From Swiss-Prot:
Subcellular location: Cytoplasm
UniProt cross-references to InterPro entries, sorted A to Z: Aldolase_TIM, His_biosynth, HisA_bact_arch, Isoase_HisA-like, Isoase_HisA-like_bact, RibuloseP-bd_barrel
Lineage, highest ranks first: Bacteria, Pseudomonadati, Pseudomonadota, Alphaproteobacteria, Hyphomicrobiales
Gene that encodes the chain: hisA
Source species: Beijerinckia indica subsp. indica (strain ATCC 9039 / DSM 1715 / NCIMB 8712)
Assigned GO CC terms: cytoplasm
Annotated pathway: Amino-acid biosynthesis; L-histidine biosynthesis; L-histidine from 5-phospho-alpha-D-ribose 1-diphosphate: step 4/9
Protein's UniProt keywords contain Transmembrane helix: no
Protein name: 1-(5-phosphoribosyl)-5-[(5-phosphoribosylamino)methylideneamino] imidazole-4-carboxamide isomerase
Annotated PANTHER family: 1-(5-PHOSPHORIBOSYL)-5-[(5-PHOSPHORIBOSYLAMINO)METHYLIDENEAMINO] IMIDAZOLE-4-CARBOXAMIDE ISOMERASE
Enzyme class, first EC level, given as a word: isomerase
Catalytic residues (positions): D8 (proton acceptor), D129 (proton donor)
HAMAP family attached to this UniProt entry: HisA
EC number: 5.3.1.16
Length: 242
């Protein structure tokens, strides 16, 4: 299982939000590239980056910060936020992004996901962000009448590389992953599922090593890594033993 440290970008800064609220942003680093390099030095091999401003604007808004990250690290970088058309997907992949995450557009334009997955095999993930079980879009500002499982099943035969499931109520709250909902999605589809939202402690990491979580492909951690609740070396060692 891969543990992805998260870098959320807002106005060029590395921040963490609480439940996706842009008014509840805490700046953790003014230099996202330096933060990425620090994660790489700690032993992480893959990075999860979100352009928060882009998620609301519907187009990339933190390109300079992402470019700086790509120039600084060798680790694999997956990127989401404001990726709503093939031209943007192609541009990011051309710059060296390993995998792009399509969120809002996966709900609004499912065919975009299918076209992109066919054109860029292994490079397309779908971000499923759920609020009370239903998918949220446009920076989590709106909720669609579609469940997480229903959305995941739409792409069962599309060749999508991964589904990234985030429980919005837990995101940034350090209350633990929503294991039940994440596993329900993973059992309903044949696409690898990555868990996100609420990872808070080494106990949560240990929970991910349990047999029932073997079907999960990875997990994303943000605030708990920044404030020291999760020791990177211990977390990575636990997952290596898994």
């Amino acid at each position: 299982m891969i543990l992805y440290p998260a870098i959320d970008l807002k106005e060029g800064h590395c921040v963490r939000l609480l439940q996706g609220d842009m008014q509840k942003a805490t700046i953790f680093n003014d230099d996202p590239a330096a933060q990425a390099a620090a994660f790489e030095a700690q032993g992480f091999t893959a990075l999860h980056v979100v352009d928060l401003d882009g998620a609301f604007a519907g187009k990339p808004m933190n390109a300079a910060a992402v470019d700086a990250i790509l120039a600084r690290v060798k680790m694999s970088v997956q990127l989401g936020g404001g990726i709503r058309d093939e031209a943007t997907i192609e541009a990011w992949l051309g710059k060296g992004i390993a995998r792009v995450i399509i969120g809002t557009a996966a709900v609004r334009d499912p065919d975009l996901v299918r076209r992109a997955a066919a054109r860029f095999p292994g490079k397309i993930a779908v971000g499923i962000d759920a609020k009370d079980g239903f998918v949220a879009v446009e920076g989590w500002a709106k909720t669609a009448q579609l469940s997480a499982v229903e959305l995941g099943k739409k792409f069962e035969d599309a060749g999508v590389a991964a589904l990234i499931y985030t429980d919005i109520a837990r995101d940034g709250g350090l209350t633990g992953l929503n294991i039940d909902a994440t596993l329900a999605l993973a059992k309903a589809v044949h696409i690898p599922v990555i868990a996100s939202g609420g990872l808070a402690s080494l106990a949560d990491i240990e929970r991910l090593t349990a047999p029932d979580c073997a079907i999960l492909a990875g997990a994303i951690s943000g605030r708990a890594l920044y404030d020291g609740r999760i020791d990177p070396a211990k977390a990575l060692a636990l997952l290596r033993k898994d």
